[in-house]
Regions:
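N-terminal membrane-anchoring alpha-helices
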Residues: 1-50, 298-299
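Intrinsically disordered, low-complexity domain-flanking/linker segments in eukaryotic proteins
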Residues: 64-99, 263-265, 294-326
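Hydrolase active-site cap/lid region
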Residues: 188-257, 277
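C-terminal catalytic histidine-bearing segment of alpha/beta-hydrolase fold enzymes
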Residues: 278-367
């Protein structure tokens, strides 16, 4: 009997700890769960990158550009760089009037070089002309401090400020790329700049969620164990959950606000894998509706579904693309892809294509 009761007791204790802000933030961000005990992320060569192109955050140069300047870049001092502006890598980024920069915001747990993250940087830079700037938020990896919603958005804004004001990359040559938790960070920093009238080349959100309480109601640990167990099926429980969650991460509201405050040009791309076992792909439906709803007015559920269907191309039984364009140069795009899971999708073609479209390298499909 005691053996049978032990898992239930543990689960109830876990839920109880989850309402305490200290434990809740450790559960959410998992920032102390990483491989720094046996990995040195100040030596990115260990993940297959060319020598000499890193800073506190990682700056990953496009490999073709590295090849052109290999003699000077490869002879730079390796390891942690305290003044990136004195490096050849910075000079190549800042002196190129056509440089394109992707600022990458990773998901929870670990650091910028953990698991499949380096593979995604390779996918974006190995054959392109794009620079990638990937950061660890406060409390993650070697970064100091403790993570919270306000702090992570401030970290992201600091990096964007640096890119615009120090590296002199204009916003129309910057794409904000977020994955999982990073989609909430990207949405938060994009909203912050939208309120100032700043418009980026694009906002690409991969495996996103509408808000933390809603996401948790469908989240499964390892894709199998429901985070909230039977509580997820109680309609009033989400309201209780939202009351106790300290970091709300209301991304759907933020996307709507971004659309509302955009005056000229906007590109929002939502990419999700059908076989994502961590965050349900249906979360993108809520984000798309929040963003598109700002341009089409209020529709009831049936009216919106009918409207959306008219702008959707079903590419297979497990995939579709919905593209909504307005006369004000706003494009909101949702793509469901059959494969890629929660993490590997970052290295799949739909993400790279979404970034290309953000930089106005438009194709002809689904127009």
């Amino acid at each position: 009997m005691w053996v049978a009761a032990a898992p239930l007791t543990f689960y109830i204790a876990l839920i109880g700890l989850g309402v305490i802000p200290f434990f809740q933030r450790h559960f959410l961000y998992a920032h102390t769960v990483n491989s720094l005990w046996w990995s040195d992320i100040n030596a990115p060569e260990g993940w297959g990158f060319a020598n000499g192109e890193t800073i506190y955050a990682w700056h990953i140069m496009p490999l073709p550009l590295y090849l052109q300047h290999e003699a000077r870049v490869a002879t730079q001092e390796t390891g942690l760089c305290h003044d990136f502006t004195r490096t050849e890598s910075f000079r190549l980024l800042a002196s190129d009037p056509e440089a394109r920069l992707i600022i990458s915001f990773h998901g929870n747990a670990g650091h910028i070089a953990q698991n499949t993250r380096p593979d995604s940087y390779h996918a974006l830079t190995d054959t392109s002309s794009y620079h990638v700037l990937a950061i660890d938020y406060r409390g993650f990896g070697h970064s100091t401090g403790t993570p919270d919603e306000k702090g992570l958005i401030l970290d992201a804004a600091t990096v964007v400020d640096w890119a615009i004001n120090v590296a002199k990359i204009p916003p129309n040559r910057i794409v904000l790329l977020g994955h999982s938790l990073g989609t909430a960070v990207a949405s938060g920093v994009a909203e912050r700049y939208a309120l100032q009238g700043v418009e980026f080349a694009g906002i690409v959100l991969v495996a996103a969620f509408s808000d933390l309480a809603t996401m948790l109601s469908g989240y499964r640990f390892g894709g199998l164990v429901p985070a909230l167990g039977p509580f997820a099926f109680w309609p009033f429980f989400k309201r209780i959950l939202d009351r106790y969650i300290v970091d709300k991460w209301h991304s759907a509201d933020r996307l709507a606000n971004i659309v509302r405050h955009t005056r000229n040009r906007l590109r929002i791309s939502l990419v999700h894998a059908k076989n994502d076992m961590d965050i349900p792909w249906t979360e993108d439906n809520k984000l798309f509706r929040a963003a598109a709803g700002e341009t089409i007015g209020i529709l009831d559920d049936d009216e919106f579904d009918s409207w959306k269907e008219s702008w959707t191309v079903q590419t297979s039984k497990d995939s579709f693309v919905t593209t909504w364009k307005t006369g004000e140069d706003t494009i909101i795009r949702q793509e469901l892809f059959p494969f890629g899971g929660h993490n590997d999708i970052l290295g799949f073609a739909p993400v790279s294509l979404a970034i290309m479209r953000s930089f106005d390298l438009e194709g002809t499909a689904y127009d």
